[in-house]
Amino acid sequence: MLWTLMSNPILIGQSTHYYDSRSSSLRQRNQPKQLLLLLLRTIIVVSVITFAAIIGCWVFLSHGTTTTNPPQQCSTPAVRKEWRSLSPSAQAKYISAVQCLMYLPSVHKEGTTLYDDFVFGHSKTGSYSHYAASFLPWHRMYLHVYERALRDHCGYSESLPYWDWTLDSHHLSASPIWDPVTGFGGDGNPGGAETLHGGRCVVDGPFANSTRAWRALSEGHNHDVEYGPHCLSRGFIINNDDRTTLDMLHGLVSPSRVAQTLDKPDYIAFFEDFESGPHNAIPQFIRGDFLTFSAPNDPVFYLHHANVDRLWWLWQQRDPVGRLYQVRGPAKDFRYHEGHEVSEGSIEDVMPMGGLAEDIKMKSVMDTRAGFLCYEYE
């Protein structure tokens, strides 16, 4: 209607033409009415346009950026702690909750477990959650869903712990994380048959000889997963294997190397250096299940990625205004799209969660102290 009034003066001209067929005096007598009608219509048009412009500006200011209206801050965030700072009782409670998930039935496939569902979901979304802008936000949400499962299904009441591997960078295989009593068990059986990717069955600790349902596949542009029951497998790189490689991996998780990563000035430089450097060093050291997209088969995966999330959190806290909602990078795993253009990732992108939870926008998980996340690190 606005466009009709502005671009079609015939609506007004028709009245003028009708009165032109009358006497001159009649035309003169009705001119004030015509002018008044024209004035009223002009006022209406201008008022509507002005109102529309005001509404448009308000919508832009409210939704056109990612930081003008962030989620509300929570008042009492939970605190995630380093594994070795937990009491033996707290460590036992966490391990018991993880074991609980391994006995609950799957929602995806009969004969598998709820724990297996997290492995399945991680593998299915590999193109979006690795070597892409969403690498850090996706895993932050993934850890949240896992933590909620421990609480909702297994009665766990604490926060997800993390493994600060910089404390073990001089000797990763001696970390207390591998303790058979207060940890997750150690290396695979050195005398056993190789299961996958240099790994052998873990035979000590709370997850000894446990069965895992899924194996990850990577073909073409997409990641996939196949059903292939096998034992939890690890194959630590030790001095006798390759001293040069071991020294390199120890160097990648050293405090000085991690400090270099934290000094990166922007998100893309930070996440690219982090993912290919300190982050990747851990699966390359552990091998076995940990070396593939079905890495969550190993319960230590969650403590490893909680530390990854912690270091991102620390990087964000150095400049909250500039970094809390900063994201940049390819929208999908660029390694599997060679020769094809990969679009730029956006904070408005929806992250697929592999059936573990509703797909969610990246911007919803950027601030750990806001919205539904509500946690921080000690």
Swiss-Prot record:
EC number: 1.14.18.-
Keywords assigned: Copper, Glycoprotein, Membrane, Metal-binding, Monooxygenase, Oxidoreductase, Transmembrane, Transmembrane helix
Chain's gene name: phomQ1'
Lineage of producing organism: Eukaryota, Fungi, Dikarya, Ascomycota, Pezizomycotina
Domain of life the protein comes from: Eukaryota
Protein name (database record): Tyrosinase-like protein phomQ1'
Transmembrane segments: 42-62
Keyword Transmembrane: yes
Localization: Membrane
Pathway: Mycotoxin biosynthesis
